[in-house]
Each structure stands twice: as C-alpha cells, then as structure tokens.
Amino acid sequence: MVVLDDDPTGIQTVHGCLLITQWDEDSVRKGFADAEPFFYILTNTRAMTREEAEQVTREAMEMVVKVNQDYGYRLIIVSRSDSCLRGHFPLETDVMRQCLVAHGYSVYEKTPFCPAFIEAGRVTIDGVHYMRDGERLIPVSETEFARDNVFAYHTSVLRDYIQEKGANPNDYIIVNAQDYDELYRFAEYLTSDIIPQTSSIVIRSSSSLPKAISGISDQPLLDKSILKQAGVGCFIVGSHVKKTTQQLENLLQQEGTCAIEVDVQRILDDAPLLMSETLDTIQQVVDMGLTPVVYTSRQEIRLDDANLRQHLGQQVSDFLVDIVYRLPFTPAYLVGKGGITSHDILTKGLGIKSARVLGQIINSVPCVMAEKFPYIIFPGNVGNEQSLSEVFNKLKG
C-alpha cells in the first residue's frame, strides 16, 4: 500500500512505517524496500493550486509505477486527504487511476470513498458525514471547514458532495464507518475474492482506513522518553481555524509558556525587521526558562482569488519556516501546528527527506524524529481546547 498524503498529518493513526517527503527514484525505492508493507509519500498537494497538485500527483505516481516494475506488487494506492472533505477531489484520484491504466494496470472499477477519521470523531452514517462534538453529531457542511477559502462545499451527503465536486457518484463506494470494526470489515472486503486479485485499487480516504488496511497493532501513546535532551520546547502555530485559536488560548494560560505573536500584515510589509525582532524575543524567552509559543495573528486576510490566497498562505508559511531554520537555540522538542505550517517545517525548516513514524504523542497527533529532537505534527482541526496544553504538560521538564 502506498499512501499519497496531501498534507503531513495523515500519519496520525500509524507507527513504524516510513514517511518520505520526496518522490525521486531513490526515495521511492526506500519505501518499497522497507520491512513494513506500506509507506507514505508526503505530496502536500492540499497547499497547492489545482495545476500544481495535478503535476505533483502525476510525478509521484509515475515514480511509484516505475519502481514497482522491479517488484510486481498489486498496488493499493490511497489518496489520503481531509476528514472534513477539503482537498483536490476528484482530481487526485482521477490522476492516480489514469497513471495506472496508462501503464497497463488493471484497476478496480469503483473508487472507495472513506472520509471517516474515527480517532477524531469524524464518522459516516447512512452516507452522511458528521463531526462528533461531545454527544452531538454535526454535519460537516455546517462546520467552518465547509466554508474554507479554497475548498468550500455545501453538503454532508457524500453522494451529493461527489456530484458537487464534478464526479459521478456511481463511480464510488461510500464507506459508512462509526468505528474501526466497520473499517476492518471493509478492509477485508478490499482483499477478498469479490475484487479480482489482479486488480489494483485507488482509494480516497482520511487517516483511519489506511491503518485498518495495514493491519498494524495499536501501541501506547508516546511520552517524555522520546526526548533526547532536557530544556524547553518550541511551538510554531500557523493554523487560523477556530479550534486552533481555542487551543492556543488555553496553551498560553499554562505556566511556563510565553506568547510571541507574528503579525501577518507585517510579514507582507516588513518581513526582515519582523524576523530579527522575533528571533531576539525567542532568545529572551528561552533565557527566562520559558517555552516560546510563536503564532500568527488570528485575523484571516480574505482574498477573492484562490491562487492569491494560496500565495499568501505560502508567504506566511515561509516566514515561519525561516524562524525554525534560524532558531537561536536547540529545543527539546518542536511542535508545528497546522497543515501547511507543519509540512514546510518538516521539509524546509528541518530538511527531512525520510523519517520513521514514531507514533502519536496524544490521540491523532503524530511524531517523527528529526536529527536532534522529536518533531510533533499537530493538525489544525484535531483535539479539544486542552490538546496543545496536553502536549506541553506531557513533555515539559
């Protein structure tokens, strides 16, 4: 199984496998040769324009197909995306199917569609997708995620969602799932004789189905034993969704943290001076024995043009990455909050080309090991108000 992940948080249910951040031949061969029968390729296409996403998906698929010539595996290709239905759909699965067919693969005629993310309370019941909030089930189309600047949608009925996005619902299998038992049953179906064993499969899913297909066992949540050194950590918060803001406010109430706000407008107007000021402040905070919490101003700058919105997001992310690259101290751990932010920190700020997934520090929050410290990839839309604080309190000295 090869999972093409459209942002870096898709490993939030697995452990032990490889995450590769490039799709050159050597990197993909490393994934195929690994002892685990599955690996993740971080394409990060959710942060790209439609045209960029198509090109990257095609490049990654072409390399997967090329390397598999030496292995001859029946391929299960997973397009891992958002449990709140944001992302380049059906573009990515269309490109995956096209690449396989073009190289002579027999591909199962239906594309399973499984946005359920059990750990975070994202469930599909009778073809309708919900977000669990305590005892309530909220249709995802009624959440802020449905009003996303780039990937907005208007329905929680998955057949209607598929049609809204320009695809034919009859080409998909809607996977209803409220728990892992249902996902394990569907995983058994995928490998049963009902589907020809010579057929490869293309799947669109969130994070839970790949775990069910892989068959990996559960493991305990990670703890302080992952730390290589004592001292304070560092939080970099780029996501601006409501849940992140609530988590940020709670984190900043914890004794031992210190807020460092980065004004997004100043990134656009006066980035060099702002960078100098921010790095100086981080050093002062660390000298006081406090954990710096660097975050972008919470007011979203709304733009009508989708490409301009993507460009703005990239400018902000580049600034945060530069902070990580130029950190004036070595943290005991680093937390990146938000999809674009955590990806760019991983690949640019830390320069990681491949990494072993350690597991999760708290439910649905994955961790990989950088050269000198663990790096925690915290999705923007996961957890409750205390979740960032929980990570801080779990790892503080």
Segments from the language model and where they lie:
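Cap/lid and interdomain-hinge subdomains that line or gate substrate/regulatory clefts
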Residues: 1, 5, 12-15, 27-29, ...
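Gly/Ser/Thr-rich loops at beta-strand to alpha-helix junctions
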Residues: 8-10, 81-91, 118-120, 179-182, ...
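Conserved, well-ordered active-site substructure
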Residues: 17-21, 330-332, 340-390
